[in-house]
UniProtKB/Swiss-Prot annotation:
Cystine bridges: none
Listed name of the protein: Bromodomain-containing protein 4
Record family assignment: Belongs to the BET family.
Marked site: Breakpoint for translocation to form BDR4-NUTM1 fusion protein: T719, E720
Record note on what altering S503A does: Impaired phosphorylation by CK2 and binding to acetylated histones
Keyword set, alphabetical order: Acetylation, Bromodomain, Chromatin regulator, Chromosomal rearrangement, Chromosome, Disease variant, DNA damage, Host-virus interaction, Intellectual disability, Isopeptide bond, Nucleus, Phosphoprotein, Repeat, Transcription, Transcription regulation, Ubl conjugation
Species of provenance: Homo sapiens (Human)
Length: 1362
């Protein structure tokens, strides 16, 4: 490839030119004479001219594109190294190259010409590229490696040319002047040299290209690379002249990557060609890739012998010259070039790339490469191996330990010198050993490793303005010098020595001048670099990128988990200034990076690498930042990361693993500074809320969550309340944390919460006070809720509770974004303490937040399906069901108590009805999934019972009759646990029997509001057994139960379905239906109704929502009073809840009645809570298990019929209060009628629901492990059989459950109730086990489910149930 030869030729020409520039005409004459001898046999012709002072300069958009895009792309290609310098016919032993190739050309020459505005139009440049490729094809055989490399480059070249701007327009050469000094100097320096080279150059470039085929074995490259250094030195003198500097400046930047490759092909190093090498070393950096070398090492082996050039004096001069050339382009280059003054700068500049070099060397020493790297670890032991001729053949031995020691001693100025020594080591091996020797094969393997890593080394910035770019330039100088001496043969060494001697004096003078120039350039660069750092463009881009940044940051958080990849050299200069103040934690050095890259290297050294946890937290914090701050984040990254500098901020994709530690630390500082500002106001808000509520549990949870999120949570809630940005990335995690905190608080505070309930609503546990506070301002709490939800549970819960029924509604919508905060705030204040008793409930607890969120969104669905009033209750029910889900018996009572005590409750119920309706529907879908997951996790029987009880309350929403049944459940539930039983009676005492009945229905409806849609879906749970036990509230509740019985029957089938939870929705629905029928028959007894309701509640906490809506309509007033809710009774101090509830209920009961008459209000469910305090405990126990299954079955299809029934019976609640028996009768009748209607509706709706549930289940299955899917395919047939068997088993279970429910109803006495919880727990455990088994089977069969077969099975099963 002529390109390869090009670099070599260029090096020689440069020395010649350098000599002439130095003002030693003799040197130029010698150079000219040398080229001729090269042509004759031993010398290379001068390189093609790259600048002509007599020729007008011109810059066009196409030429600019060729330099910045086409040439830059080709230069970085792994096959480009042979074409980066003129062909060194001497070094490669190609005496006939320049005889065959009359017009040599290489990319190094083209690059210089483009940088010097040598071309008049783009066509001339394209012609040079074509000449380079043609020379390679002419001189080399078609199958040679070099030809294949040239073809690959040509293909890429043609692809880039297709994108060339169509119209060529001239551009002012202002920038050229900026680089100008060096360029002008180069032009002046080269004029004399160029005149001679012009004639020879034509021949030389072709020669350069052709030899490349031979050099392809990079083995020789190490030596040639050193040769490059001498070339740089020669150019340095040129730089002193002034014209040379410009020339060097442009080449050094591209050459940096290439220097290693360039030297390899440059046998010319024996000549002053070292000069040519300078630009190439810089360029070669990327171009030199070992892959190319490995392909042709055998051909180069003989050629690489010359790399051992004796003239090391050249290297010293060359190093100085190269320094001068570098200063011309970037200040950093200048500093390294002047070894005396710039030496310190050099070390800092080189640091980034030399760090990479150190990493490459470490990898080469790694054990994984030891099998083929061991021969290169130490110097060749000539005596031990008996290699007496080794020193004669290998003039410059090299080994990895020597390279390591030089690297540690900072003897390498840049990566190019390092690469030259490594390649010298390999070339020595190829040169001394025969091609088929095993050591050669080992060298090629190791060189492949080296070249791959070396090619990936981050490029030094090529922009002259940026100081960072300079580091790349100096490295080549060092590397070039040693290789040049080794590469040049002994014959050429004498010539080069003479030329170097002549120019040494001049070099010393030039060095002084260059150092002064470097100082001036550095000052200019510093001035330029600062504006770049503050460039507004990047800020604007950053602003645009803000949105994308948020989403990408989230992805990055996941990516951060991956092991850290190489970090590109830091580009801190631009962003450091702006980001330093903001990012206090990131890196102290970022500010330094601004002015010079050297600081960056130091900073990089000082920077502590980020741990995975730190990166994850950083990504979370970045997601919290508002949009206006993200722009700055992008700016910081772009300014510090060369690879992302030119990326489009709107589409930037950032992988934390690829970012430098300094960049990450700078980001950390900035984000921390931004978040601190936000946190202060947020903290104030939290304090205000905490002070008002003074909730210990919430405060503890808040502190925990804040600590966990590292203050990111508070910021998120505060700043992103409006933007909702935190909700996207951080919220999920924060919410989880909050849930954990709530669970912990509930576990720790279960006793305290009961204690708090003793104080009436005003003094409930810390959570209750917030509720009270929020009650007066129901509207404000909703807004505060979202803010405080994530950061501090304290503040958010009080608003929810304070709102009571009305507040709950606004909060629910607000909580859609902050599900956890809202859920815990309104409902969980008391429930949280309850959760601890039942460990499995935490899953439910987490579920409630989601339910609440969904409730906020889904209430519209409830509105559509049910009357507005019922839907509102369901909304509230959505909030309440989380309480049952949590085993906090005391907390529910407390929460309800505060709500009940307030007289506004009567009015709030209406508000709640309106506001809460929308929330309920969403809860159903989310709750279904959450409960299913929780059920699996929380299989403990105890949790299941409580959950069932809680859910049993929701079932009442089905038809108006269910409200009485809900009351029965509440009363009956207390009996199942011995302690709860006493609680219901005190509540009844406080409240007249009729009123308690109303209150209980209200509470149930509140809880059931979520379940109503699931009624059809709710699977029967053992809870029915427990539900019947509560006999104490028998009188008032009996009436309600009679009405509810029909619904309870329905709910039972649903609970059965839940047991099946794993099976398709249809199966769940059908069992529910069957249970409803059986329950309907059994419903006349209160006990039957209660078990069914409990099942419903347990089966689907979410489903209860629709049920609650229906119930509430019928029992408007009672439901409104349901605030106390059964969960509160569960707590250890049921007496307190009862007392609190009783006073609250007494004053509010009248209010409740009017609300009921006016419209069905949802608040009554809260009133129900006080009597069911005891039952709540059981329910909570059951809930954990059942809630999981119920989630799937949350559907509102039956809501329409329920709503109609509710509307018909809105007045029944008041009548119930007057005559509990009459109201129960009415409810039972309505329930029975609804059951009949619902059966027809269910037949139709269940088909759609089954399909929907199937889709849900399929989605869940698709998420299951792939292994399970593979197994599923194998066991597809078995799975079908299992399903059939399971369906039969479920049917049997449903029948058994129905029987159990009847038995429980029969055992209305407290003894029966106490015995029921155990049987219920056993049943629930069995159900949970079966569900888990079914879930696993479904997972296994997920990929092979036959939907037609499934539908048939479901239809058959449904028929059997009904």
């Amino acid at each position: 490839m002529s390109a390869e030869s090009g670099p070599g030729t260029r090096l020689r020409n440069l020395p010649v030119m350098g000599d002439g520039l130095e003002t030693s005409q003799m040197s130029t004459t010698q150079a000219q004479a040398q080229p001729q001898p090269a042509n004759a046999a031993s010398t290379n012709p001068p390189p093609p001219e790259t600048s002509n002072p007599n020729k007008p300069k011109r810059q066009t958009n196409q030429l600019q594109y060729l330099l910045r895009v086409v040439l830059k792309t080709l230069w970085k290609h792994q096959f480009a190294w042979p074409f980066q310098q003129p062909v060194d016919a001497v070094k490669l032993n190609l005496p006939d190259y320049y005889k065959i190739i009359k017009t040599p050309m290489d990319m190094g020459t083209i690059k210089k010409r483009l940088e010097n505005n040598y071309y008049w139009n783009a066509q001339e440049c394209i012609q040079d590229f074509n000449t380079m490729f043609t020379n390679c094809y002419i001189y080399n055989k078609p199958g040679d490696d070099i030809v294949l490399m040239a073809e690959a480059l040509e293909k890429l070249f043609l692809q880039k040319i297709n994108e060339l701007p169509t119209e060529e327009t001239e551009i002012m050469i202002v920038q050229a002047k900026g680089r100008g000094r060096g360029r002008k100097e180069t032009g002046t320096a080269k004029p004399g040299v160029s005149t001679v080279p012009n004639t020879t150059q034509a021949s030389t470039p072709p020669q350069t290209q052709t030899p490349q085929p031979n050099p392809p074995p990079v083995q020789a490259t190490p030596h040639p690379f050193p040769a490059v250094t001498p070339d740089l030195i020669v150019q340095t003198p040129v730089m002193t002249v002034v014209p040379p500097q410009p020339l060097q400046t442009p080449p050094p930047v591209p050459p940096q990557p290439q220097p290693p490759p360039a030297p390899a092909p440059q046998p010319v190093q024996s000549h002053p060609p070292i000069i040519a090498a300078t630009p190439q070393p810089v360029k070669t950096k990327k171009g030199v890739k070992r892959k190319a070398d490995t392909t042709t090492p055998t051909t180069i082996d003989p050629i690489h012998e010359p790399p051992s050039l004796p003239p090391e004096p050249k290297t010293t001069k060359l190093g100085q010259r190269r320094e001068s050339s570098r200063p011309v382009k970037p200040p950093k280059k200048d500093v390294p070039d002047s070894q005396q003054h710039p030496a310190p700068e050099k070390s800092s500049k080189v640091s980034e790339q030399l760090k990479c070099c150190s990493g490459i060397l470490k990898e080469m020493f790694a054990k994984k490469h030891a099998a083929y790297a061991w021969p290169f670890y130490k110097p060749v032991d000539v005596e031990a191996l008996g290699l007496h001729d080794y020193c004669d053949i290998i003039k410059h031995p090299m080994d990895m330990s020597t390279i390591k020691s030089k690297l540690e001693a900072r003897e390498y100025r840049d990566a190019q010198e390092f690469g030259a020594d490594v390649r010298l080591m390999f070339s020595n091996c190829y040169k001394y050993n025969p091609p088929d020797h095993e050591v050669v094969a080992m060298a090629r393997k190791l060189q492949d490793v080296f070249e791959m890593r070396f090619a990936k080394m981050p490029d030094e910035p090529e922009e002259p303005v940026v100081a960072v770019s300079s580091p790349a330039v100096p490295p080549p100088t060092k590397v070039v010098a040693p290789p040049s001496s080794s590469d040049s043969s002994s014959d050429s060494s004498s010539d080069s020595d003479s030329s170097t001697d002549d120019s040494e004096e001049e070099r010393a003078q030039r060095l002084a001048e260059l150092q002064e120039q470097l100082k001036a350039v550095h000052e200019q660069l510093a001035a330029l670099s600062q504006p770049q750092q503050n460039k507004p463009k990047k800020k604007e881009k950053d602003k645009k990128e803000k949105k994308k940044e948020k989403h990408k940051r989230k992805e990055e958080v996941e990516e951060n988990k991956k092991s850290k990849a190489k970090e590109p050299p830091p580009k801190k200069t631009k962003k450091n200034n702006s980001s330093n103040s903001n990012v206090s934690k990131k890196e102290p050095a970022p500010m330094k990076s601004k002015p010079p890259p050297t600081y960056e290297s130091e900073e990089e050294d000082k920077c502590k690498p980020m741990s995975y946890e730190e990166k994850r937290q950083l990504s979370l914090d970045i997601n919290k930042l508002p949009g206006e701050k993200l722009g700055r984040v992008v700016h910081i990254i772009q300014s510090r990361e060369p690879s992302l500098k030119n990326s489009n901020p709107d589409e930037i994709e950032i992988d934390f693993e690829t970012l430098k530690p300094s960049t990450l630390r700078e980001l950390e500082r900035y984000v921390t500074s931004c978040l601190r500002k936000k946190r202060k106001p947020q903290a104030e808000k939290v304090d205000v809320i905490a002070g008002s509520s003074k909730m210990k549990g919430f405060s503890s949870s808040e502190s925990e969550s804040s600590s966990e999120s590292s203050s990111s949570d508070s910021e998120d809630s505060e700043t992103e309340m409006a933007p909702k940005s935190k909700k996207k990335g951080h919220p999920g995690r924060e919410q989880k944390k909050h849930h954990h905190h709530h669970h912990q608080q509930m576990q720790q505070a279960p006793a305290p919460v009961p204690q708090q309930p003793p104080p009436p609503p005003q003094q409930p546990p810390p959570p209750p006070p917030p509720q009270q506070q929020q009650q007066p301002p129901p509207p404000p709490p909703p807004p505060s809720m979202p803010q405080q939800a994530a950061p501090a549970m304290k503040s958010s819960p009080p608003p929810f509770i304070a709102t009571q029924v009305p507040v709950l509604e606004p909060q629910l919508p607000g909580s859609v974004f902050d599900p956890i905060g809202h859920f815990t705030q309104p409902i969980l204040h008391l429930p949280q303490p309850e959760l601890p008793p039942h460990l499995p409930q935490p899953p439910e607890h987490s579920t409630p937040p989601h339910l609440n969120q969904h409730a906020v969104v889904s209430p519209p669905a409830l509105h559509n399906a049910l009357p507005q009033q019922p839907s509102r209750p369901s909304n509230r029910a959505a909030a309440l069901p989380p309480k049952p889900a949590r085993p906090p018996a005391v907390s529910p009572a407390l929460t309800q108590t505060p709500l009940l005590p307030q007289p506004p409750m009567a009015q709030p119920p209406q508000v709640l009805l309106e506001d809460e309706e929308p929330p309920a529907p969403p809860l159903t879908s989310m709750q279904m999934q959450l409960y299913l997951q929780q059920l699996q996790k929380v299989q403990p029987p105890t949790p299941l019972l409580p959950s069932v009880k809680v859910q049993s309350q929701p079932p009442p929403p089905l038809p108006p009759p269910p409200h009485p049944s809900v009351q029965q459940q509440l009363q009956q539930q207390p009996p199942p646990p011995p302690p709860p039983q006493p609680q219901p009676p005190p509540q009844q005492q406080h409240q007249p029997p009729p009123r308690p009945v109303h209150l209980q229905p209200m509470q149930f409806s509140t809880h059931i509001q979520q379940p109503p849609p699931p009624q059809g879906q709710q699977p029967p749970h053992p809870p029915p057994g427990q539900q019947p036990p509560p006999p104490q509230p028998a009188k008032p509740q009996q009436v309600i139960q009679h009405h509810h019985s029909p619904r309870h029957h329905k709910s039972d089938p649903y609970s059965t379905g839940h047991l099946r939870e794993a099976p398709s929705p249809l199966m769940i629905h059908s069992p529910q239906m069957s249970q409803f029928q059986s329950l309907t028959h059994q419903s006349p007894p209160q006990q039957n109704v209660q078990p069914k309701k409990q099942e419903l509640r347990a089966a689907s906490v979410v489903q209860p929502q629709p049920l609650v809506v229906v119930k509430e309509e019928k029992i408007h007033s009672p439901i409104i009073r349901s605030e106390p809710f059964s969960p509160s009774l569960r707590p250890e101090p049921p007496k307190h809840p009862e007392s609190i509830k009783a006073p609250v209920h007494l004053p509010q009961r009248p209010e409740m009645k009017p609300v009921d008459v006016g419209r069905p209000v949802i608040r009554p469910p809260e009133q129900n809570a006080p009597p069911p305090g005891a039952p709540d405990k059981d329910k909570q126990k059951q809930e954990p298990k059942t809630p999981v299954a119920p989630k799937k079955d949350l559907k509102i299809k039956n809501m329409g019929s329920w709503a109609s029934l509710v509307q018909k019976h809105p007045t029944t609640p008041s009548s119930t209060a007057k005559s509990s028996s009459d109201s129960f009768e009415q409810f039972r009748r309505a329930a029975r009628e609804k059951e009949e209607r619902e059966k027809a509706l269910k037949a139709q709706a269940e088909h759609a629901e089954k399909e929907k549930e199937r889709l849900r289940q399929e989605r869940m299955r698709s998420r299951e492990d792939e292994d399970a899917l593979e197994q599923a395919r194998r066991a597809h047939e078995e799975a079908r059989r299992r399903q059939e068997q399971q369906q039969q088993q479920r049917q049997e279970q449903q029948q058994q459950q129905q029987q159990q429910a009847a038995a429980v109803a029969a055992a209305a006495t407290p003894q029966a109730q106490s015995s029921q919880p155990q049987s219920m727990l056993d049943q629930q455990r069995e159900l949970a086990r079966k569900r888990e088994q079914e879930r696993r089977r479904r997972e296994a069969m997920a990929a092979t489910i036959d939907m037609n077969f499934q539908s048939d099975l479901l239809s058959i099963f449904e028929e059997n149930l009904f």
